[in-house]
Amino acid sequence: MIILSIETSCDETSASVTQDGKKVISNIVFSQIKEHSLNGGVIPELASREHLKNITLVLEKSLKEANIQPQEIDLVAFTQGPGLIGSLLVGINCALVFGYIYKKPVLGVNHLLGHIYAAQIENEIEFPSLVLIISGGHTELLALENYLQIKKLGFTCDDAVGEAYDKVSRILGFGYPGGPIIDELAQKGKDIFNFVRPYLKNDNFNFSFSGLKSSIFNLVSKNNFNLQEKINICSSFQSSVIDVLVEKTKRVLKKYSFKQLIITGGVAANYSLRKRFLSEFSQLKVIIPSLKYCGDQAAMIGIAAYYQFKYQLKFNQNYHWEGKPNLSF
């Protein structure tokens, strides 16, 4: 089955052609980082306009690189949510028009399911698997019990981990996006600030990062730190975040049995985090997608769509789909 997929949930415009839930034939991603870095974060209205400007070009380039004609497509998949509603609608309408013109079935996919199935591209997912999704908008621990059977075990009560990175980077004056900036600087710093490890006193598997962010804001507001001291803050902040993610994951594994641990989402591209998880959980098969499949891109939507189309008992078979910005499991 050849699937054309479109991803526009936030600030990446992406189109991909995949085959049989495994092979990535093309995967074109147009990033808006340059546009949003000027504002220190994603501006929803600007993101929507950029998607409108680039979606046709990205779609055409994806088909051309795959050497696939529209008539050869078996299914058109798109991100239905969660995400920014304006951004979602650009991708949804593009997919619906394409499907209608070429008489192809269309299928809306949960963006988070896409992140999970990014792990399938270069590996084989086994069930049950424990999944940690860490991105700019989500921090969740999930039990993947079967292809589409997912149980939420833990979630963030406030800021997602990627959001915390962006805000701390902005507090320190290092810009956007905060994830890669702080990760790089943290490796040049010393972990000398004893920041709180939030929510570790709680017995549940949930997360909270707003308090950590606030403590850094208060610290920076009261002191005139030099560059090296700010770099040290990056190191201590990152150590705190990774400690919490590792400890919460360990708690789940003490209570439940899983065949694999899947770490996915944009923050899974973090060098220190990847290294730490591979070291801490060496007794378990740990799957972390390649860097190119950690962030938002349409290949993961196409892979997820294959299994959703194959195993979902029923779904909307017409061309009337709506965006769901708060879609969850």
Swiss-Prot record:
GO terms for biological process: tRNA threonylcarbamoyladenosine modification. Fe cation binds at residues 111, 115, 296. Binds 1 Fe(2+) ion per subunit. It comes from the Bacteria. InterPro entries: ATPase_NBD, Gcp-like_dom, KAE1/TsaD, TsaD. One of its GO terms (cellular component) is cytoplasm. Its cofactor is Fe(2+). It is found in: Cytoplasm. CDD domains: ASKHA_NBD_TsaD_bac. It catalyses: L-threonylcarbamoyladenylate + adenosine(37) in tRNA = N(6)-L-threonylcarbamoyladenosine(37) in tRNA + AMP + H(+). Substrate binds at residues 133-137, 166, 179, 183, 270. Its main location: cytoplasm. Its EC number is 2.3.1.234. Keywords: Acyltransferase, Cytoplasm, Iron, Metal-binding, Transferase, tRNA processing. One of its GO terms (molecular function) is N(6)-L-threonylcarbamoyladenine synthase activity. Required for the formation of a threonylcarbamoyl group on adenosine at position 37 (t(6)A37) in tRNAs that read codons beginning with adenine. Is involved in the transfer of the threonylcarbamoyl moiety of threonylcarbamoyl-AMP (TC-AMP) to the N6 group of A37, together with TsaE and TsaB. TsaD likely plays a direct catalytic role in this reaction. Belongs to the KAE1 / TsaD family. This is tRNA N6-adenosine threonylcarbamoyltransferase. It comes from Phytoplasma mali (strain AT). The lineage of its organism: Bacteria, Bacillati, Mycoplasmatota, Mollicutes, Acholeplasmatales.
